[in-house]
């Protein structure tokens, strides 16, 4: 792979010289600012060899560097090894910004110009980068050129897989009702219309789903909503007669996907709302109407608060997922003891068991199954080169999830496969304590996830421990497993948590070269109590799966924490046992027996 990356960089630099570009920047996103992207837009991976979901590659005529966050530090070190790419660790002291690095690298170049594809870089990112580069020696930016169109000879085409209707029995709200709410929000923002670029927002609004992106049931498109018209820009080959008729019945006009830029140039309403974090730089610049209302899209918050039907769907999906997880966990340790199991084989087994459940559509992300030191790689993905043989000792971290038509699941369990060290027990127990504290918290309506983050981390900070990823993210309803805008994380995220939101609780500790521990449930924010001081909220676990008690250091657990775990395990057994065969039920009874 090292030689392949060198050849690709050589080809890129030949094109850069011809185009008089001093550098080119490759983000990890697509034309819709998606986290997970279709193969057509996986250019950053193609040019660098790094396959993480977050990262930016920057190539000059003589150097190459890749920026990524803490989830991928270890994976990036391994994947970039032997290439000329220098790893830049984001949010680590001493790491330069892209503009700072380019300013240093291009200091001796006369009138340097940097290239970016304006269709895959958001307006806000571009605006900030252009301003910073201008300060670093007058570097200019070109946005109308994509060298991958020239050098990536077998570049996959934009996907055109079929679209399907998400029935009202799972969606819980009609397309027309959603449009009415969106238009009402636009009036409050003094906007006549809006462009929707985010694929999950489009799928949610229209009650449609697709398979254009691995593990995320969305379809490549744009949606333009005005006061009296709705326009969907999509490859019509995706649309079955049923979907076409459904859209026509709901007054949705169809246009070719690649005509969105032309339509924006002739947009006749007085103004339009554009979300600078979701709208590409090129589309923003195409708008010619009198005023652009620069504002966050109102759709993500609407989508984040699940309606009653969606909540019921989540509960059903979690029940089926819990059944699959119990079958898997009962199988796991005996299978490892018999020998022959690897990280990849247990991944296949878990996916197979999930696929037996009704309404299963896909996994919700590529399973992370990290044994021993691989567990310390936050977003590890086993390959044939790294696939570790499992032994009846130590711990394996398994982060996995599924897409069911009535709900999306995301769960992490760290499991002792046999004897574990005292160090492992201590770290495991501290992570469990952090997990429990988030589930125990009660908080006033209007609090953000940032204000709750320290509640979970506190017991880790006392021990001088920390993790650099977020504590929790929203989860879509048969949509993206990572959903915003609400999060639980250290960095300031002002979106308040509201009853009806789903969010994960996933603290972890990762010791490079040794092991990692993460424990994750998906939670539902619910009403707790109304007092003279206002409304208070709480967290309800939706995930139904036992937490391994074998590695717990009991002396570290408080009575309140033991009570929470016992209550959780009681609920898991009560809800799952009626649906289990006798052997699975007996195993679950043992796995959920109360702590003393």
Where are these regions (language model features)?
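Active-site neighborhoods and metal-handling regions in enzymes and metal-associated proteins
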Residues: 1-596
């Amino acid at each position: 792979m090292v030689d392949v990356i060198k050849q690709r960089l050589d080809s890129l630099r030949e094109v850069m010289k011809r185009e008089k570009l001093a550098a080119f920047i490759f983000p990890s996103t697509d034309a819709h600012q998606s986290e997970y992207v279709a193969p057509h837009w996986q250019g950053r991976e193609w040019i660098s060899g790094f396959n993480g979901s977050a990262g930016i590659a920057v190539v000059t005529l003589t150097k190459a560097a890749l920026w990524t966050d803490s989830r991928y530090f270890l994976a990036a070190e391994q994947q970039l090894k032997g290439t000329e790419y220098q790893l830049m660790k984001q949010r680590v002291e001493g790491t330069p910004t892209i503009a700072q690095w380019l300013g240093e690298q291009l200091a001796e170049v006369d009138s340097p110009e940097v290239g970016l594809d304006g269709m895959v870089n958001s307006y806000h990112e571009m605006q900030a980068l252009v301003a910073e580069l201008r300060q670093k020696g007058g570097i200019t930016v070109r946005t109308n050129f994509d060298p991958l169109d020239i050098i990536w000879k077998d570049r996959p085409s934009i996907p055109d897989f079929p679209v399907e209707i998400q029935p009202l029995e799972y969606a819980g709200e009609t397309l027309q009702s959603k449009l009415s709410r969106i238009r009402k929000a636009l009036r409050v923002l003094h906007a006549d219309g809006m462009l929707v670029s985010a694929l999950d927002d489009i799928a949610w609004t229209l009650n449609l789903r697709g398979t254009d992106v691995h593990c995320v049931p969305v379809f490549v498109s744009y949606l333009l909503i005005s006061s009296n018209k709705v326009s969907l820009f999509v490859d019509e080959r995706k649309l079955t007669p049923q979907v076409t008729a459904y859209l026509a019945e709901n007054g949705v006009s169809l246009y070719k996907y690649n005509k969105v830029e032309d339509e924006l140039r002739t947009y006749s309403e007085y103004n339009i709302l554009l979300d600078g974090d979701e709208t590409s730089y090129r589309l923003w610049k195409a708008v010619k109407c009198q005023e652009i209302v620069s504002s966050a899209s109102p759709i993500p918050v609407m989508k984040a608060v699940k309606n009653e039907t969606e909540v019921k769907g989540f509960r059903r999906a979690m029940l089926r997922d819990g059944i699959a997880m119990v079958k898997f966990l009962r199988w796991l340790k005996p299978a490892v003891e018999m020998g022959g199991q690897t990280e990849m084989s247990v991944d296949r087994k878990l996916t197979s068991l999930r696929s037996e459940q009704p309404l299963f559509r896909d996994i919700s992300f590529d399973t992370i199954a990290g044994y021993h030191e691989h567990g310390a790689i936050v977003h590890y993905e086993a390959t044939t080169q790294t696939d570790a043989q499992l032994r009846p000792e130590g711990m394996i971290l398994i982060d996995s999830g599924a897409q069911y038509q009535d709900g999306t699941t995301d769960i992490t369990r760290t499991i002792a496969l046999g004897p574990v060290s005292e160090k492992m027990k201590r770290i495991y127990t501290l992570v469990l304590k952090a997990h429990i504290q988030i589930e125990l918290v009660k908080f006033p309506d209007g609090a953000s996830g940032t204000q709750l983050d320290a509640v979970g981390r506190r017991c880790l900070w006392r021990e001088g421990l920390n993790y650099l990823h977020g504590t929790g993210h929203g989860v879509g309803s048969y949509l993206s497993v990572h959903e915003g805008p609400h999060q639980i994380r250290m960095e300031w995220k002002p979106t308040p948590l509201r009853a009806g939101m789903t969010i994960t609780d996933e603290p972890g500790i990762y010791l490079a070269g040794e092991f990692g521990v993460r424990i994750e449930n998906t939670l539902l924010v619910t009403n707790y109590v109304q007092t003279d001081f206002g409304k208070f909220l709480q967290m309800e676990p939706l995930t139904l799966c036992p937490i391994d008690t074998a590695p717990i250091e009991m002396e570290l657990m408080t009575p309140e924490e033991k009570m929470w775990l016992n209550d959780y395990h009681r609920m898991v057994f009560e809800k799952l046992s009626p649906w289990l065969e006798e052997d699975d039920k007996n195993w679950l009874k043992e796995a959920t027996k109360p702590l003393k």
